[in-house]
C-alpha cells in the first residue's frame, strides 16, 4: 500500500517539500492543504483543499476523509495554531512540533527566557518589556541594540542599531510603536555574519543539514528594507566559505542542548524541523532566533541535496528512530534566488502575470503566486524561486541567474546573491572580526 501524506502550506518551501516527498522510491500519494492554489504543489498532488492553513478542525476533517497516514506542516502559523497537536490526537503522526515546542518560534520573549533558564549557549544580554520607560532606559544602558516584537512577524519585525535604526532615538521610537501591540524583546546587537543551521529532529536525535546563508535585505549590496529572504546559498560541504569547522560544531551543540531542554521544559519531544538562525561573531556563533520549521528560502537549498529517501526520514522523525537512519547529502553547492513583485516588500504589485520561460538546469519553486485559468499571478509577496546546483557556488550562481533572466513579469531580484564578490566580502568581514585567522581551517 502506498502511504498517503498530507502537506500543509502553499509557499516555495512547501513546493520543495512536496518535491522531496514525491521523489521517494515508495511512491507516496500526496495531498495538500493551502490557502491559494500553488501551481507547483498542485501538479504533484493527487488532491488538494484550498483552505486557511490555521483552520485546525477543517484540516483534521480533510485528513480523516482522505485517510492520511502522515502529515508535514510547512509554515509557522499552523504550528502556532496547534495543527500538529490536533492531527496527533486524531491518530495522524506529524513532522512539525506540537504547540508546546513551537512556542520557541512564535514567542521571542519565551524563547530568550527559556535559553537563559537552561544555560543555552549563545544567548545575548536581553530584557523583555511591556512598558515604555524601563524599555527606553535599557536601550540607553546597552547602547547597541536589536529590537524585536515578541510574536510572529514573517521575518520582518526585527530592527537593529546602525542598520534600520540610525540612533538611540530611532530605537526608542520603534520600541514605543511595538509596545502598542504587545511585549518587546530588547537585546544586545551582535556583530558578525549570519548563517542558518537546520536539522530534522525526532524528539532527541538531530540530523543536520549543511549551513546556509540567507539575504534578508531587499536590494543589492544588502540595502533596503527587511524581507522574508531574497535568496540563499550553500557550499559543497557542511560549512560556508567564511566559517571554520569548529563554528558549525558549536552551533550543533547549541541546537542539541535546545532540543534536550525543550523536552525537559515541556514534557513533549520536539518532532519536526528545527531552524537555528546564528550570527558568527569573533567569539563564535550566537543565537539570533530559533524557528520551528524549514527556512524559506533555505529549504530550497537543502532539500534537493538529500540523498536519503525523504519519506523514510519523515517516518524516522515521527517514530523517534533518526539515530538508526543515516541522512546523507550530495556534496554540491546551491544558490537560490527569488523573483519578487515590483515594489516589494512595502508597495508590491499584485495580481500581475508571471511567465516562466526556459530555466535550463535550474529548479523552479512557486511561492506566493496563484493559478487562474492556466495563468500564474503574483499575490504581493515573493513570487518564484530558482535554484542552481553545481560543484561550486560560482557555477550554481550562474545557473540560477540564467534562469531568472527567463522569468518575465513586473518582478525584480538580487543579482549579487552567490556571486564571488559578495562572498569575498563575507570572508573579509569574518577575517577582520577574528583578527586575520584564515578561513575553512
Swiss-Prot record:
Mg(2+) 2 binds at residues 289, 291. Pathway: Purine metabolism; IMP biosynthesis via de novo pathway; N(1)-(5-phospho-D-ribosyl)glycinamide from 5-phospho-alpha-D-ribose 1-diphosphate: step 2/2. InterPro entries: ATP-grasp, ATP_grasp_subdomain_1, PreATP-grasp_dom_sf, PRibGlycinamid_synth_ATP-grasp, PRibGlycinamide_synth, PRibGlycinamide_synth_C-dom, PRibGlycinamide_synth_C_sf, PRibGlycinamide_synth_CS. Mn(2+) 2 binds at residues 289, 291. It holds the Pfam family GARS_C. Mg(2+) 1 binds at residues 277, 289. It catalyses: 5-phospho-beta-D-ribosylamine + glycine + ATP = N(1)-(5-phospho-beta-D-ribosyl)glycinamide + ADP + phosphate + H(+). Belongs to the GARS family. PANTHER family: PHOSPHORIBOSYLAMINE--GLYCINE LIGASE (PTHR43472), PHOSPHORIBOSYLAMINE--GLYCINE LIGASE, CHLOROPLASTIC (PTHR43472:SF1). This is Phosphoribosylamine--glycine ligase.
Amino acid at each position: 500500500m502506498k502511504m498517503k501524506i498530507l502537506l500543509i502550506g502553499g509557499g516555495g518551501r512547501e513546493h520543495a517539500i512536496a518535491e522531496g516527498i514525491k521523489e521517494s522510491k515508495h511512491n507516496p500519494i500526496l495531498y495538500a492543504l493551502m490557502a491559494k492554489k500553488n501551481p507547483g504543489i498542485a501538479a504533484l498532488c493527487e488532491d488538494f483543499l484550498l483552505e486557511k492553513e490555521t483552520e485546525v478542525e477543517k484540516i483534521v476533517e480533510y485528513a480523516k476523509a482522505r485517510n492520511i497516514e502522515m502529515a508535514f506542516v510547512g509554515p509557522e502559523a499552523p504550528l502556532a495554531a496547534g495543527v500538529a497537536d490536533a492531527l496527533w490526537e486524531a491518530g495522524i503522526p506529524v513532522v512539525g512540533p506540537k504547540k508546546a515546542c513551537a512556542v520557541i518560534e512564535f514567542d521571542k520573549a519565551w524563547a530568550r527566557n527559556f535559553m537563559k533558564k537552561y544555560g543555552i549557549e549563545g544567548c545575548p544580554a536581553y530584557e523583555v518589556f511591556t512598558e515604555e520607560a524601563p524599555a527606553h532606559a535599557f536601550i540607553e544602558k546597552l547602547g547597541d541594540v536589536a529590537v524585536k516584537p515578541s510574536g510572529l512577524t514573517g521575518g520582518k519585525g526585527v530592527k537593529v542599531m546602525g542598520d534600520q535604526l540610525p540612533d538611540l532615538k530611532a530605537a526608542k521610537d520603534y520600541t514605543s510603536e511595538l509596545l502598542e501591540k504587545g511585549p518587546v524583546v530588547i537585546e544586545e546587537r551582535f556583530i558578525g555574519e549570519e548563517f542558518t543551521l537546520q536539522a530534522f529532529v525526532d524528539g532527541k536525535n538531530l540530523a543536520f543539514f549543511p549551513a546556509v546563508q540567507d539575504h534578508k535585505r531587499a536590494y543589492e549590496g544588502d540595502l533596503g528594507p527587511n524581507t522574508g529572504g531574497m535568496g540563499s546559498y550553500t557550499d559543497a560541504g557542511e560549512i560556508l566559505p567564511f566559517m571554520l569547522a569548529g563554528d558549525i560544531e558549536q552551533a550543533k551543540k547549541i541546537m542539541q542542548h535546545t532540543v534536550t531542554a525543550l523536552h525537559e521544559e515541556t514534557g513533549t519531544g520536539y518532532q519536526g524541523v528545527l531552524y537555528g538562525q546564528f550570527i558568527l561573531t569573533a567569539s563564535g556563533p550566537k543565537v539570533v532566533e530559533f524557528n520551528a520549521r524549514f527556512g524559506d528560502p533555505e529549504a530550497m537549498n537543502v532539500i534537493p541535496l538529500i540523498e536519503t529517501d525523504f519519506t523514510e526520514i519523515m517516518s524516522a522523525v515521527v517514530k523517534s528512530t533518526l539515530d538508526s537512519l543515516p541522512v546523507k547529502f550530495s556534496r554540491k553547492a546551491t544558490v537560490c534566488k527569488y523573483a519578487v513583485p515590483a515594489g516589494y516588500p512595502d508597495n508590491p504589485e499584485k495580481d500581475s502575470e508571471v511567465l516562466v520561460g526556459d530555466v535550463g538546469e535550474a529548479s523552479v519553486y512557486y511561492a506566493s503566486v496563484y493559478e487562474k485559468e492556466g495563468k500564474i499571478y503574483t499575490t504581493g509577496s515573493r513570487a518564484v524561486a530558482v535554484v542552481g546546483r553545481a560543484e561550486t557556488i560560482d557555477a550554481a550562481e550562474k545557473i540560477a541567474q540564467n534562469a531568472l533572466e527567463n522569468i518575465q513579469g513586473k518582478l525584480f531580484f538580487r543579482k549579487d546573491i552567490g556571486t564571488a564578490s559578495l562572498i569575498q566580502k563575507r570572508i573579509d568581514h569574518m577575517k577582520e572580526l577574528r583578527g586575520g585567522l584564515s578561513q575553512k581551517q
